[in-house]
């Protein structure tokens, strides 16, 4: 096995401050278990931790049992890549199967939300239930970890007992939206080595080191769906109920295969051609009428039916675990990679808030998460219960 001290990266040396002998000695007392996904971000994160003097071991999590004939999750290939990187870095790689926990705590909730007509975000739930709960507990209790680490593009500030969650330095890759359910305690038990650098630098470090994952494509989509079509996947678990597509005025303009296949603000894939007596402006989904099984659409990107003045959110998680009891000015994202929206939080009770936007917003989607910020600090968030017109 390659000794970890033999590997070096000029790119790393350029972008990371050299630690003092005292800092290295202090870090050497700490054991870090890094979640190795078989991707470039966790691969480079492991190297960075080694350079910072920590005792580093990897853990590969298998969270989904594929069908034998349809290996969509590429788990075998990802494990092989994670093992190749671990071997290159001279690092032990543990393996664990969390498929049962994933099914019970992530996947069943995902299906139930779709049944209820909402559009859930399983990545957020996976981080909450698997990566920063099952993994964190296993690493601490079974592997003796002082910290866990992941390849997420986020940062932390403050000491371990009073840590804050910050956006990643790379605005294009910032993943704090997916981690808003973490408590300050969980953040304090976690390290995010690539949060302070930009993605191209991560790739360059991997190339410097000759890692197998250096040119590997970023994973897209939800793990358990992989590269297959979302519609085909969902149909295996939930019976579809076709119905009518109507305009806000009640005019029938088409048919849908099932409300669960559609989300608010959606334009593509509606299958509505030119409709006699209507303009050629594209149609957008503005409502899912569950009672009548009707998909309601409106024409034009700026149609007032698409706009929301705010939202109601529940299932709140604040990073500092202190409920908000007074009105608060901040910004919010109602979906990943959205530009921040200026808003005011108005608490209704400790688990429900009203959020009023400074400017009306399109496609505020029940089931998705609203995540709040003050500057770079992620305050926390909640699940959108309803949009306010």
Swiss-Prot record:
The keyword Transferase applies. It catalyses: S-sulfanyl-L-cysteinyl-[protein] + uridine(34) in tRNA + AH2 + ATP = 2-thiouridine(34) in tRNA + L-cysteinyl-[protein] + A + AMP + diphosphate + H(+). Residues 121-123 are annotated as: Interaction with target base in tRNA. InterPro entries: MnmA-like, MnmA-like_C, MnmA-like_central, MnmA-like_central_sf, Rossmann-like_a/b/a_fold. GO terms for biological process: tRNA wobble position uridine thiolation. Keywords: ATP-binding, Cytoplasm, Disulfide bond, Nucleotide-binding, RNA-binding, Transferase, tRNA processing, tRNA-binding. It is an enzyme of class 2 (transferase). Transmembrane segments: none annotated. GO terms for molecular function: ATP binding; tRNA binding; tRNA-uridine 2-sulfurtransferase activity. The active site is at residues 126, 223. Its EC number is 2.8.1.13. GO terms for cellular component: cytoplasm. Disulfide bonds join 126-223. The record marks 152, 368 as: Interaction with tRNA. ATP binds at residues 35-42, 61, 151. Residues 173-175, 335-336 are annotated as: Interaction with tRNA. It is found in: Cytoplasm. Belongs to the MnmA/TRMU family. Catalyzes the 2-thiolation of uridine at the wobble position (U34) of tRNA, leading to the formation of s(2)U34. This is tRNA-specific 2-thiouridylase MnmA. It comes from Actinobacillus pleuropneumoniae serotype 3 (strain JL03). The lineage of its organism: Bacteria, Pseudomonadati, Pseudomonadota, Gammaproteobacteria, Pasteurellales. The gene is mnmA.
């Amino acid at each position: 096995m390659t000794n970890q001290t033999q590997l070096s990266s000029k790119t790393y040396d350029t972008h990371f401050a050299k630690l003092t002998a005292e800092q290295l000695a202090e870090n050497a007392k700490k054991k870090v278990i890094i979640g190795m996904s078989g991707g470039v971000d966790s691969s480079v994160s492991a190297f960075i931790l080694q350079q910072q003097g920590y005792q580093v071991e990897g853990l590969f999590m298998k969270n989904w049992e594929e069908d034998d004939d349809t290996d969509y999750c590429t788990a075998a290939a990802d494990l092989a890549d994670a093992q190749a990187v671990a071997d290159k870095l001279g690092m032990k790689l543990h393996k664990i199967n969390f498929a049962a926990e994933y099914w019970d705590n992530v996947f069943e909730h995902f299906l139930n939300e779709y049944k209820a007509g909402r559009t859930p975000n399983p990545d957020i739930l996976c981080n909450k239930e698997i990566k920063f709960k099952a993994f964190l507990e296993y690493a601490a209790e079974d592997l003796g970890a002082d910290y866990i680490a992941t390849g997420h593009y986020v940062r932390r500030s403050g000491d371990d007992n009073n840590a804050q969650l910050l956006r990643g330095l790379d605005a294009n890759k910032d993943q704090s939206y997916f981690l808003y359910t973490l408590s300050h305690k969980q953040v304090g038990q976690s390290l995010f080595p690539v949060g302070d650098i930009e993605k191209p630098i991560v790739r360059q470090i991997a190339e410097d080191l000759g890692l197998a994952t250096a040119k590997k494509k970023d994973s897209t989509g939800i793990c358990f769906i992989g590269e297959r079509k979302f519609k085909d996947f969902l149909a295996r678990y939930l019976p579809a109920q076709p119905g009518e597509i109507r305009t806000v005025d009640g005019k029938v303009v088409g048919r849908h295969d099932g409300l669960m296949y559609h989300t608010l603000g959606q334009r593509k894939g509606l299958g509505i051609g030119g409709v006699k007596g209507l303009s050629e402006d594209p149609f957008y989904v503005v409502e899912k009428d569950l009672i009548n099984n009707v998909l309601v659409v409106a024409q034009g990107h700026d149609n007032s039916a698409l706009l929301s003045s705010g939202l109601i959110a529940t299932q709140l998680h604040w990073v500092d675990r202190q409920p908000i009891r007074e009105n608060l000015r901040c910004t919010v994202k109602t979906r990943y990679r959205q530009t921040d929206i200026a808003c005011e939080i108005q608490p209704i009770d400790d688990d429900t808030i009203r959020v009023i936007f400074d400017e009306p917003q399109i496609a505020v989607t029940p089931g998705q998460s609203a995540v709040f910020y003050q500057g770079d600090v992620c305050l926390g968030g909640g699940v959108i219960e309803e949009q306010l017109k």
